[in-house]
Amino acid sequence: MMEATPTPGSLSWRLSSHPITLLTFLAFRSSSLLVYLFGLLFTDNLVMIFIITILLLAGDFYYLKNIAGRRLVGLRWWNEVDPNSGDSHWVFESSEPGTKIINATDSRFFWLAIYAQPLLWVVLAIVALFSLKFIWLPLVAIALVLTITNSLAFSRCDKFSQASNIAGTAFSSGNIAGNIASNMVGRFFSR
């Protein structure tokens, strides 16, 4: 019997342009949740579960921000501090429109995981509150800060990318005009 091939854009890691990056991204995204949910089955040491979950969340934050975002959807962000004024602002980077074709499967996995994980942590915070397990709330709060930061940053980065692509095509008559449009849009989103 023949196996049906998945359609492009479906949630099958086999269709990914970067399967190792995608699987590592999904492993980081799910591992912190799994350790939080099932850690007590393997050890009674709450501190150990807390530390492992924090390390996995930090690894997820770093991997998503610096590797998975760039390889899967062509987006990257970082925070810069002006040394003179001390003002902080986010900087967004996206791949050039003609240089990278974003795989629909990679994009669906990326955006689904980016928005689903903070929602799951909110549910876990509510469960911790109603089950009166307040000891877990600091861990959930840290998880929410890290996952929501990445979600907001990548959402803004995607909006910046779309706006600069529109501005770039409108002013594509010359490289200077495209750079001016990109810088204007970048300044608008960095406020």
UniProtKB/Swiss-Prot annotation:
GO terms for cellular component: Golgi membrane. It is found in: Golgi apparatus membrane. The keyword Transmembrane helix applies. Pfam families: DUF846. It is a multi-pass membrane protein. The chain crosses the membrane at residues 20-40, 46-64, 109-129, 134-154. GO terms for biological process: protein secretion; vesicle-mediated transport. Glycans are attached at residue 103. InterPro entries: TVP23-like. Keywords: Glycoprotein, Golgi apparatus, Membrane, Transmembrane, Transmembrane helix. Belongs to the TVP23 family. Golgi membrane protein involved in vesicular trafficking. This is Golgi apparatus membrane protein tvp23. The lineage of its organism: Eukaryota, Fungi, Dikarya, Ascomycota, Pezizomycotina.
